[in-house]
Amino acid sequence: MKYARVRTHGGVSIISAFIDGMGGAFSIDVPMTVTVREGTCSEEKKISEDIRRYLSIATCFRFTVDSRIPSGYGLKSSSAYILALAKAMAVYSGIDISDMEIMTASADISKNSGLSMTGALDDLCQAMYGGYCLTDNRKMKILRRGRLPEMPVLVCADGDKRSSGKVSIEGHFTNAIRRVEDLAFKGRIFDAAVANGLIYGSIFGMDLRLIGSMLKAGALYSSQSGKGPAIFGIFADRRSAMNARSDIGFGIVTKINNQGIRYWKYDS
């Protein structure tokens, strides 16, 4: 049976774009795989119908999702999901479409469907290319991207889930977030991610206990991933990350990911 399969990854916030539209994220090795097959239009899910209409695809689809990304915790599951689904549908249909076109389609559909307030080009970019991406989400431009050392990462997703579709921020945080942007564009990606998490943690709340446990176990960097509530820690070695997980009692030990999106098409 003919089908297409796409694998991408979740990520961690470097700069959350809710304040001024500037965004950034880096990829972690927590995969999501989406498989699409031809389906019946009467049973098609709305998200695949929206993508199909946007890309002018006639075929109706059914699909399955196999994901290790905790959803609703600030680890980029929505962007990975919509990008992988759109890419799989394009691959299945044999559409010649550029990376930027598929990311633009995914961003527009994310905003229209309420999955994202900004379109999250930064999150889509890290899911497309791996490594890190810095973007202008309002102008839909990738400003910088590159590889990172594949250091061990512990992510702990706990607490109430938080939607990215509707985010309300009261107060004047522009100056603070621009200092984060300065760090990121100077190449201090992890410092920026920490500072960004602290800013958004001050707005939405964060689990300082988890951050403290990671730092106590030897994390080089630890903070909240954007608006959270997931907490991340970056470690010099896997043993330290495993020890932190043991002390905390839960979490995913993984690593920074530099592998971009992968896809396969089967006609058997």
Swiss-Prot record:
One of its GO terms (molecular function) is ATP binding. Pathway: Metabolic intermediate biosynthesis; chorismate biosynthesis; chorismate from D-erythrose 4-phosphate and phosphoenolpyruvate: step 5/7. It holds the Pfam family GHMP_kinases_N. Keywords: Amino-acid biosynthesis, Aromatic amino acid biosynthesis, ATP-binding, Cytoplasm, Kinase, Nucleotide-binding, Transferase. ATP binds at residues 70-80. Signal peptide: none annotated. Disulfide bonds: none annotated. One of its GO terms (cellular component) is cytoplasm. It is found in: Cytoplasm. It comes from the Archaea. It catalyses: shikimate + ATP = 3-phosphoshikimate + ADP + H(+). GO terms for biological process: amino acid biosynthetic process; aromatic amino acid family biosynthetic process; chorismate biosynthetic process. InterPro entries: GHMP_kinase_C_dom, GHMP_kinase_N_dom, Ribosomal_Su5_D2-typ_SF, Ribsml_uS5_D2-typ_fold_subgr, SK_arc. Its EC number is 2.7.1.71. SUPFAM superfamilies: Ribosomal protein S5 domain 2-like. Belongs to the GHMP kinase family. Archaeal shikimate kinase subfamily. HAMAP family: Shik_kinase_arch. This is Shikimate kinase. It comes from Thermoplasma acidophilum (strain ATCC 25905 / DSM 1728 / JCM 9062 / NBRC 15155 / AMRC-C165).
